Each structure stands twice: as structure tokens, then as C-alpha cells.
């Protein structure tokens, strides 16, 4: 008889109604039969938590540096093969680069082959291409290598044999 004293639970055809206080209550249709269970509690319906707004100080915005960026740098690009002679760099944070251009699969193989010369460059990009440029062919990819100095770049170009199907462009990049 102790089992019969358990609280009743509604049948599987029970309906869920939301009261104006924001709690969910179970209601039973008139033609359903009750089942025994102890889960007749009201379930609170609360909205999911919102993300907190980020708080920034008035001095610094997101993704900004504490040092102001200025154009007081008097360094100029001075590469003999560069067509933009005397171009002023806006930041002292530039690094020498080489763009290798060619068929994407050839560039991928070249990038794998130069892994034994890791000490002669800093970073190598994946194969990429310019989008939305009229007059370019689809089979023209680019791999970019960065160097710590112009001397390191020159040592790389002297040491590594570059296939004739790959063209290269020297330059600098702001990082």
C-alpha cells in the first residue's frame, strides 16, 4: 500500500502550459489516465544567459596597441629589383619577403622541398591567389616566404635552386 501513496504523474499525453509567472506546469487532458511518479514539480522557464558586454578602458580600444602608430620612420625600401623605389614605409615593423608565383601544385611541391632549408627563412605561406583580379589565369598561385633580414633572404636565393616554371618577386611586408 505504500506504493499507492506516491504522488501521481500524468500520462504520456500530458500537455505543457506556461503560466504568466514564467514557470512550466504540467496539465492533463480530460480523457487521460494518471501514472505514478514523483515528477509533478513546476519547471522554471528562464531565458538563456546573455553574453556580457566587453569592458574597455577609455584609453584603449580592442585590437589596438598601447604604442601609437606614427609615420616618423624615415626608412625607405632600397631594393634594386623593386619598381617602387623610395616608397616610404609607414611602420618600422617590416620584413623582407619573396613571392613565388606559378602553378599551384608546383608551388606545393617546392614548399615541401625547401623544408630542409628551414634555417634560411622564417615562415612559408600556403598556396594562395588574388581574387577578383581581371586578366589573371586560374592556375596561377603564390607562395610567400618571410625572412628575418635581407642577408638571410639573399643567402636563401643563393643556396636554393628555384625551378624555371616558378617566377619570384622580392619585396617587404609590414607585420
Swiss-Prot record:
Keyword Nucleotide-binding listed: no
Listed InterPro entries: E2/EBNA1_C_sf, Nucleotide-bd_a/b_plait_sf, Papillomavirus_E2_C
BP terms from Gene Ontology: regulation of DNA replication
GO cellular component: host cell nucleus
Keyword rRNA-binding: no
Positions of region (Disordered): 15-98
Basic and acidic residues composition bias: residue spans: 72-82
Keyword annotations: Host nucleus
Molecular function in Gene Ontology: DNA binding; DNA-binding transcription factor activity
Coiled-coil ranges per UniProt: none
Superkingdom of the organism of origin: Viruses
Pfam families: PPV_E2_C
Polar residues bias: start-end ranges: 17-41, 57-67, 83-94
Residues of the signal peptide: none
Cell compartments where the protein resides: Host nucleus
Function: Plays a role in limiting the replication of viral DNA in keratinocytes. Recruits the host NCoR/SMRT complex to viral replication foci to mediate repression of both viral replication and transcription.
Family per similarity comment: Belongs to the papillomaviridae E8^E2C protein family.
Protein name: Protein E8^E2C
Organism name: Human papillomavirus type 54
Amino acid at each position: 500500500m505504500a506504493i499507492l501513496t506516491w504522488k501521481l504523474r500524468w500520462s504520456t499525453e500530458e500537455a505543457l502550459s506556461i503560466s504568466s509567472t514564467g514557470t512550466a506546469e504540467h496539465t492533463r487532458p480530460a480523457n487521460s489516465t494518471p501514472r505514478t511518479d514523483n515528477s509533478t514539480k513546476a519547471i522554471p522557464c528562464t531565458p538563456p544567459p546573455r553574453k556580457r558586454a566587453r569592458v574597455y578602458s577609455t584609453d584603449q580600444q580592442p585590437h589596438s596597441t598601447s604604442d601609437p602608430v606614427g609615420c616618423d620612420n624615415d626608412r625607405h625600401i632600397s631594393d634594386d629589383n623593386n619598381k617602387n623605389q623610395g616608397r616610404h614605409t609607414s611602420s618600422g615593423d617590416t620584413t623582407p619577403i619573396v613571392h613565388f608565383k606559378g602553378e599551384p601544385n608546383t608551388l606545393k611541391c617546392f614548399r615541401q622541398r625547401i623544408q630542409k632549408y628551414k634555417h634560411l627563412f622564417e615562415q612559408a605561406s600556403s598556396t594562395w591567389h588574388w581574387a577578383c583580379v581581371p586578366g589573371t589565369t586560374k592556375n596561377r598561385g603564390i607562395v610567400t616566404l618571410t625572412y628575418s633580414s635581407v642577408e638571410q633572404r639573399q643567402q636563401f636565393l643563393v643556396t636554393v635552386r628555384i625551378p624555371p616554371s616558378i617566377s619570384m618577386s622580392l619585396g617587404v611586408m609590414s607585420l
